[in-house]
């Protein structure tokens, strides 16, 4: 038997990163651990969707997508937008005591902002909702959506803006 699967994805226009920087909070108890800030300006057309990822050079084998990495412009269309991001570790990485979730002075980080189409955003959103609700007996059941007809998974075209941040 022949199984046919079909998928399509629209390559959206690139939305460049305006700035990315490493920030140690004023309330920090460790002067070498901080957060990553990224900003961009959303185009004035409603319906843009994004995904964010990061990779520590020489430490992470690939870009890491944290939970909550996908969003759209329904809450801020056509305006500058800045957000702070914690560091997610790669699978099975042991974190030193007190350093989980923080970037560290001396890290060189590639920050990537991806413009994705609405179908990809919707599929990713159902996946993230399902993963974040695991083990919660009060969470409603979630069916993870796919944008592949006749199959499971995602077919995603993305335009990416990448910035390099030196954590100093």
Describe the residue ranges of each PLM region.
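A sequence/structural signal for flexible, mid-protein segments enriched
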Residues: 1-168
């Amino acid at each position: 038997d022949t199984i046919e699967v079909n998928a399509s994805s629209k390559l959206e226009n690139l939305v460049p990163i305006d700035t990315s920087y490493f920030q140690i909070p004023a309330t920090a108890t460790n002067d070498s651990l901080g957060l990553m800030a990224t900003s961009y300006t959303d185009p004035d057309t409603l319906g843009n969707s994004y995904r964010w990822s990061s990779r520590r050079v020489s430490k992470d084998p690939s870009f890491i997508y944290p939970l909550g990495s996908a969003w759209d412009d329904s809450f801020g269309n056509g305006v500058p937008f800045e957000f702070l991001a914690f560091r997610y570790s790669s699978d099975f990485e042991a974190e030193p005591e007190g350093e989980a979730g923080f970037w560290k002075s001396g890290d060189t980080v590639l920050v990537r902002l991806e413009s994705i189409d609405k179908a990809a955003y919707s599929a990713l959103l159902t996946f993230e909702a399902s993963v974040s609700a695991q083990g919660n007996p009060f969470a409603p059941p979630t069916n993870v959506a796919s944008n592949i007809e006749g199959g499971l998974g995602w077919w995603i075209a993305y335009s990416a803006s990448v910035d390099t941040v030196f954590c100093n």
